[in-house]
């Protein structure tokens, strides 16, 4: 009996230590919650071809100054989708912008924002994607002129410009503000379109969310700070209504790429999350329109 007690006394702290170093991706994802993460992250708008595309089967063309990118198939198809990815592969893609074979993704895949997501959100999303119908849909290769087609160049780009720091709540702000900051800067990846970029495709960290003259498909994307040309005259309720039903305070309807964002993402968020986004956006320092 004494020997057993001594053994247990030794094993309990040992097991605790081992459990503390188990890889986080060993956690399990919640598919039901993952569907909500899918909506927060706006996956459908990019990974489903408009009107007649198979759900999440990719193939949507994104036209940019660097060439045309085609969004990948993220259904569980093992040949043309992500059916042979494990949880670690998926987390690495979102957190590091790397494929299962170690290749570097272009930042048209907004891992530059997704890296701020919690690992649990990533795993929940993967769990949901594992439940959708597998679709065999080979996607065209990106059509990029030299030198942008050299994928290995992304190693240097990421080394210089990629900040993979996870989101950290601000203890001086409310829970609603922190939730809004997390959604806007993490899964919602709002800055990927609403922040201006330089000639190397790097977002201007000095002018976050100040608008972008050359957004998706060459369209201008508005300033969503309270600054001149922005949404300074919008109330929090105005922001919530816009994200929920796509109508501006002056009764205009949403247009351009934001139409898909509202239909496939923000309109499906909870009232509390929409209010959290509004709380965060109305608190931002005003920045002059960058368009």
Locations of regions flagged by a protein language model:
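Extended, well-folded interaction surfaces typified by the phenylalanyl-tRNA synthetase beta subunit core
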Residues: 137-152
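Bacterial N-terminal signal peptides
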Residues: 9-20
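The canonical Cys-X-X-Cys-His
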Residues: 34, 40-50, 90, 125, ...
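A cross-kingdom marker for long, charged
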Residues: 244, 256-291
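Electron-transfer interface patches adjacent to heme c in soluble/periplasmic c-type cytochromes
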Residues: 61-92, 112-122, 208-249, 262-274
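Electrostatic cytochrome c docking/interface patches
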Residues: 21-39, 156-185, 228
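N-terminal secretory signal peptides that target proteins for export/translocation
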Residues: 1-7
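Membrane-embedded segments
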Residues: 88, 97, 102-106, 110-113, ...
